Amino acid sequence: MAKGQSLQDPFLNALRRERVPVSIYLVNGIKLQGQIESFDQFVILLKNTVSQMVYKHAISTVVPSRPVSHHSNTGTNQAGTNYSGGNATQQDDVAE
């Protein structure tokens, strides 16, 4: 597994498993909302009224609607494993 995915995969998997609503901001400023249905190395399948395949290279930010945590495979809770939406970097004025 690539080092960059050691954080990405557990985060996306927790969002998928817990069916957490997310806002996905694309690099062009578009905001998509829904639940992560599935994902792989290159795409995320986002479900709302329809399913959309979103290429990861087009994604700027994934913002969960509520805090989500994941744990490492070692069973220890390491720093940086909690994620929460509503941080100061969230953009509310993005074109929809």
Curated annotation (Swiss-Prot):
Domain of life assignment: Bacteria
CDD domains referenced in this protein's UniProt entry, alphabetically: Hfq (cd01716)
Endpoints of the signal sequence: none
Sm domain span: 9-68
Amino acid composition bias (Polar residues), ranges on this chain: 70-96
GO biological process: regulation of DNA-templated transcription; regulation of RNA stability; regulation of translation, ncRNA-mediated
SUPFAM superfamilies: Sm-like ribonucleoproteins (SSF50182)
Start and end residues of each stretch annotated as Disordered: 64-96
One Pfam family this sequence matches: Hfq
GO CC list: cytosol
Keyword Lyase listed: no
Swiss-Prot/TrEMBL keywords: RNA-binding, Stress response
Biological function: RNA chaperone that binds small regulatory RNA (sRNAs) and mRNAs to facilitate mRNA translational regulation in response to envelope stress, environmental stress and changes in metabolite concentrations. Also binds with high specificity to tRNAs.
Complexes and interactors: Homohexamer.
Family designation: Belongs to the Hfq family.
Protein name (record): RNA-binding protein Hfq
Organism per entry: Proteus mirabilis (strain HI4320)
